[in-house]
């Protein structure tokens, strides 16, 4: 079983914020597959489905971003998953421009509290990450305030497109492997840069 975890914060007030792009990506994938992420287990909302002929569990931790590792550690244990081969995490990335996407593995948290929580809880940084850029073109004072504020209408249009790209990245990772997906999606012309 592959675990595909989107990071975000529960609650309607956070639904369309930059920090919730992981949740939005999971919702997009689930919606396109005709499943609902609503089963509660291991402090997360989950749904089982098949992608690229593989059984997967889509998950959205309900522990809030900074404690995401608690839920993910329980999911990894429950499904006897190996983080280095069975876990894909979809996260927002303030260091990348809005609408860009990169796939990485074995990286530090780069200051992302949700990823820091996962690394601490799992005892490894060796897991695959789909990092979706959220840095705005406009200047923002406080990054944390921006991450938790609703996206503007123009930003939502960009997000709509990158969520499709994130879904394509997940499918390619599962079908062709991480290296092939990195080769395709980490190129500048595929990410909007």
Segments from the language model and where they lie:
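Conserved TIR/SEFIR loop-to-helix hotspot centered on a Trp-containing motif
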Residues: 109
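Nucleotide and nucleotide-moiety/phosphate-recognizing core
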Residues: 2-106, 116-130, 137-142, 149, ...
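Active-site YXXXK catalytic motif of short-chain dehydrogenase/reductase
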Residues: 112
């Amino acid at each position: 079983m592959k675990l595909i975890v989107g990071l975000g914060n529960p609650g309607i007030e956070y639904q369309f914020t930059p920090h919730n792009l992981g949740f939005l990506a999971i919702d997009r994938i689930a919606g396109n597959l005709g499943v609902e992420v609503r089963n509660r287990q291991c402090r997360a909302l989950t749904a089982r489905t098949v992608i690229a002929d593989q059984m997967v569990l889509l998950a959205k931790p309900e522990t809030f971003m900074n404690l995401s590792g608690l839920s993910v550690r329980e999911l990894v244990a429950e499904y006897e998953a190996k983080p280095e081969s069975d876990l894909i995490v979809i996260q927002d990335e303030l260091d990348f421009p809005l609408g860009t996407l990169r796939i990485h593995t074995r990286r530090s948290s780069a200051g992302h509290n949700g990823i820091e929580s996962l690394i601490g809880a799992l005892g490894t940084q060796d897991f695959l990450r789909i990092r979706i850029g959220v840095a705005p073109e406009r200047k923002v004072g406080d990054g944390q305030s921006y991450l938790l504020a609703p996206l503007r209408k123009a930003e939502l249009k960009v997000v709509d497109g990158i969520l499709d790209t994130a879904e394509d990245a997940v499918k390619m990772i599962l079908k062709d492997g991480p290296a092939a997906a990195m080769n395709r999606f980490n190129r500048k012309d595929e990410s909007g840069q």
